[in-house]
Each structure stands twice: as C-alpha cells, then as structure tokens.
C-alpha cells in the first residue's frame, strides 16, 4: 500500500525530487512511494506535462536512469546571476579528453593520448576527481592497460538521459576527417572549446 493517498502521489513525487537535489533512481522513488517502477514513470510523465502546460521555471527530466527536478534552460541566466559555481569550468583539454572518452569508451590512456597528440595524465586525474570518469576495467592486451568510461555524474553534468543523447558519431567523424585534412591528428571536434 502506498505511503500516501493515491491523489497525493504526484505531489509526493514532486517533494522527493525537490529535496533530493539531484537524480533519483526509479527504484528508489518507487520504494519511497510504495508503488511499482512503472507507476513512477507515469507519475513523472504527469508532472512533466503539468510543468510544461503551466510554463513553470522548473522541469522534471529523465537523467542517468532516474528523474531529477531542475530549472528550465531558458532561465539559466537568472540562476547564474544568483549562484556562483563551486568548481571551475572544465578546460578545453579536459573537454576534449572527456569527448574522446564519451564517444570511444571504454578507452585507454594511450588511445586518448594518440587522438589528442599530447599526454593526458593531469587532465584524466582531474576528470576522475570530478567524478565524470572512472576506471571500467582492463583491456585484453599486453600490459592490461586500464580502460576508462564516463559515470552517471557525467550524464548529470551534461543533462543527458543516457549516452544515446550524444550527437551522432557520424557527424563528429565527418568533422574529424576535416580536421585531419587541415593537419590535425584527429581530436574529437564538435564539442565546447573547439577552435
């Protein structure tokens, strides 16, 4: 039996997402509300529709395998005027390395360095310490190098539901070929910080 009356479940979901401050898995929400995971998806869809219809400043988004309450992008400038980011923005080198990992994961440090044409040790350590990248295994190759991949925090950071929301790799590959023709080694173009 649900913890709340059925008429209040949508409001209860709204409260849970508000106090969470970040993405909450469907299973966690279902357990708190005493409903099935499919019911959470239906309640979230109702909230999404309500927020869109009433043109609220907030939205409910499917992010990293769950749901999150967040501000609508068109109101970002107001939020930025009020808040200062806790962490400095990612450098161009970090964004390039992160793009390589996102599109080619799992990927080794050596593969990243080949694509970028420079060492990535410092940048990789920064991405790991920020929780955007993690070790995901070992490559079946001599020396068994560490493989890296993105984390759920990466999805949250970029507001993605899953990696399928990244721009199609074909578009990136075409831009990469243009970069090679211009004399580059093939770093992943089409991402913030590209010149």
Curated annotation (Swiss-Prot):
PANTHER family: SEGREGATION AND CONDENSATION PROTEIN B. Pfam families: SMC_ScpB (PF04079). It comes from the Bacteria. Participates in chromosomal partition during cell division. May act via the formation of a condensin-like complex containing Smc and ScpA that pull DNA away from mid-cell into both cell halves. It is found in: Cytoplasm. The gene is scpB. Its main location: cytoplasm. This is Segregation and condensation protein B. GO terms for cellular component: cytoplasm. Belongs to the ScpB family. Keywords: Cell cycle, Cell division, Chromosome partition, Cytoplasm. One of its GO terms (biological process) is chromosome separation. Homodimer. Homodimerization may be required to stabilize the binding of ScpA to the Smc head domains. Component of a cohesin-like complex composed of ScpA, ScpB and the Smc homodimer, in which ScpA and ScpB bind to the head domain of Smc. The presence of the three proteins is required for the association of the complex with DNA. It comes from Moorella thermoacetica (strain ATCC 39073 / JCM 9320).
């Amino acid at each position: 039996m649900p913890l709340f009356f059925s008429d209040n479940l949508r409001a209860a979901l709204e409260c849970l997402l508000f106090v969470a401050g970040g993405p909450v898995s469907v299973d966690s929400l279902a357990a708190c509300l005493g409903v099935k995971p499919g019911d959470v998806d239906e309640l979230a869809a109702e909230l999404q529709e309500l927020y869109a219809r009433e043109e609220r400043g907030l939205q409910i988004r499917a992010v990293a395998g769950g749901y999150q309450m967040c501000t609508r992008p068109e109101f970002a400038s107001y939020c930025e005027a009020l808040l200062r980011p806790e962490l400095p923005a990612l450098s161009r080198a970090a964004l390039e390395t992160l793009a390589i990992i996102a599109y080619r994961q799992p990927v080794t440090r050596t593969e990243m360095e080949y694509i970028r044409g420079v060492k990535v040790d410092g940048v990789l350590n920064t991405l790991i310490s920020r929780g955007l990248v993690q070790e995901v295994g070992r490559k079946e190759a001599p020396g068994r190098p560490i493989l890296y991949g993105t984390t759920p925090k990466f999805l949250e950071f970029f507001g993605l539901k899953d990696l399928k929301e990244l721009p199609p790799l074909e578009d990136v590959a075409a831009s990469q070929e243009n970069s090679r023709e211009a004399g580059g080694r093939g770093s992943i173009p089409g991402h913030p910080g590209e010149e």
